[in-house]
Design a protein with these regions (language model features):
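Structural preference for solvent-exposed beta-strand-turn elements
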Residues: 1-148
């Protein structure tokens, strides 16, 4: 796995997945985010075994694909420190995820992607299409019925 991505892309994706990353995990892998890289995109996936969030970002420069996991919180904190216009170079070096920018070089320990629990995707028998605006309106009209 070897690719470049703009800071804003990876930070946006990491922030979206952090909400589901376990703070007090029973399995160490649940503190990690799954990286899946192909020619044009980076998919980040996080789970707490009840919920799963997956994001897709466009990569700037692809060298090789692959999968790994890395600590979500550490990675997010590190990426936020980089300058806003940074292009971040991610690549695997043995059991480490190497991260390079113009401001420095960093290593994060990884866990095998095979250990990451992924939900089975189910195809819906029936589906509807709804605009985000209509969905937001429907949720706001029923929010009073939710428990605290």
């Amino acid at each position: 796995m070897d690719f470049y991505i703009k800071k804003e892309e990876v930070v946006k994706s990491l922030n979206a997945t952090l909400g589901v990353v376990e703070k007090r995990q029973t399995l160490p892998i649940l503190a990690n985010v799954l990286f899946e890289v192909d020619e044009s995109s980076l998919r980040l996936t996080a789970t707490d075994l009840e919920s799963e969030i997956s994001t897709i970002s466009t990569i700037a420069n692809f060298k090789s694909g692959g999968k790994t996991t890395a600590p979500a919180k550490k990675l997010s904190e590190l990426c936020r420190l980089f300058s806003d216009d940074s292009e971040i170079h991610f690549f695997l070096d043995g059991d480490n995820l190497r991260i390079e920018t113009d401001s420095g070089k960093y290593n994060l320990a990884t866990l095998p992607s095979e250990d990451f629990p992924v939900f089975e995707k189910e195809e819906a028998e029936n589906s509807i299409n709804i605009t985000a605006q209509n969905l937001k309106s429907l949720i706001s009209k029923t929010a009073f019925a939710m428990g605290n």
